[in-house]
From Swiss-Prot:
This is Tyrosine phosphatase-like protein J3. SMART domains: PTPc (SM00194). It comes from Microplitis demolitor bracovirus (isolate Webb). Signal peptide: none annotated. Belongs to the protein-tyrosine phosphatase family.
Amino acid sequence: MTTQPDSMSAIDFLIFMEHPVSLSSIADEYYTIVPRQEVKALSSSNQTMNEEQEHSCMRIIRFLHCRVKLSGNRNVLNANYVDGYEHKRKYIYTKSPCANNVDEYLQMMWDKNVEIIVVPSRSENDVNFHQYWSPNEGAVIEYDNFKIETLEVTTKPQYILTLLILTNRKGRIHRISHFEYTAWPVYSICHDLRAFLDFVSNINEQYTYLEKHKPSRQTRSYNCAFASMVTIAQQYFVYLIPVLQNSKRRE
């Protein structure tokens, strides 16, 4: 006889997170999903491959099993598929590009049909960060294989939503919604979770809108890529959002 886990509403979750041991409890639950030895092996492999790229910020835990490949079977550095709550390989976790690999980054967004990019936090001290799009509406930046136009910028108290148009050499276009969370403290996990939940909720609304308005014949491989360095706490919250939504639907 299997025991069904207790459901938790979003409000109950926020109350739970106020408890001092809540984060360790979430970590314990995470390790019941992903074996510790797998995390250790993946972290060790990642350290060997990217040791020169690691800074003082927390390393991304590789949830899952394989790296992203472009056409020609080329691996994309710092890009891994990640399972969602109900779907395999629902997300791509990656780093924002450096100045010398923007084309490779944009090629991944194009090849994998990514329509939403999420930047949960940006380290102001990361010297390798390169803003590959313009903050000004109507501006266009050209690269070797792509040009990217900033169509619209919407600034909210906790995040910035930028609508981008990616154009390849053949003149074909691809639209991307770029969400950047601006309220997360760079060196602390102490934060108002309601603001972060609101951020994720707005991403989900955009996802629902895209699903509703996609052409009937269009297939979509990957809707969302998480860019930049994602903290462990943020990974837990993003993973738990659909869990909470699913439990709410059952209430």
